[in-house]
Amino acid sequence: MKSVDLKILDARMRDYLPTYATPGSAGLDLRACIDKAITLEPGATTLVPTGLAIHVADPGYAAIILPRSGLGHKHGIVLGNLVGLIDSDYQGQLMVSTWNRGQTAFTLEPMERLAQLVIVPVQQVSFNVVDEFGASERGAGGFGSTGRS
């Protein structure tokens, strides 16, 4: 299994290091590394620091930042860019673009769990221009082509 070194930029994070909640967990919780609460009004966005820096280094891997399901479902708090992609050569602090798509103001407290970090494999592709594709059962069938008849 690949190990990725996470560097801590903020000493306050020492007591809040990300951990996997269960042996089957794919994501690590990212926290709001802020000094005081932030209130997000409906429709508002803000960048929230996590206090963590990452350098994946291996181009065969990347990190993605995903929303926490409870915050999105209960409070309308999601990522402003829906999914954050962290390339293997990025070396800075992880920031979470936070968007309140709900109808009421939401207050984000210091060190509150805000998003999840997942490390994923990456396969870079090369392109080959062709005149046509080989036959397949599906062909060019698009939206809904494998659903209801």
UniProtKB/Swiss-Prot annotation:
Gene Ontology terms: biological process: dUMP biosynthetic process; dUTP catabolic process
The keyword Magnesium appears for this protein: yes
Keyword Hydrolase (UniProt): yes
Keywords: Hydrolase, Magnesium, Metal-binding, Nucleotide metabolism
Entry EC number(s): 3.6.1.23
Residues annotated to bind substrate: R68, S69, G70, N81, L85, I86, D87, M95
SUPFAM superfamilies in UniProt: dUTPase-like
Recorded metabolic or biological pathway in which this protein acts: Pyrimidine metabolism; dUMP biosynthesis; dUMP from dCTP (dUTP route): step 2/2
Enzyme class: hydrolase
UniProt catalytic activity: dUTP + H2O = dUMP + diphosphate + H(+)
InterPro entries: dUTPase (IPR008181), dUTPase-like (IPR029054), dUTPase-like_sf (IPR036157), dUTPase_trimeric (IPR033704)
CDD domains given in the database record: trimeric_dUTPase
Gene Ontology MF annotations: dUTP diphosphatase activity; magnesium ion binding
Pfam family, one: dUTPase
Cofactor: Mg(2+)
Function: This enzyme is involved in nucleotide metabolism: it produces dUMP, the immediate precursor of thymidine nucleotides and it decreases the intracellular concentration of dUTP so that uracil cannot be incorporated into DNA.
Family stated for the protein in its record: Belongs to the dUTPase family.
Listed name of the protein: Deoxyuridine 5'-triphosphate nucleotidohydrolase
Organism: Bordetella avium (strain 197N)
Origin organism lineage: Bacteria, Pseudomonadati, Pseudomonadota, Betaproteobacteria, Burkholderiales
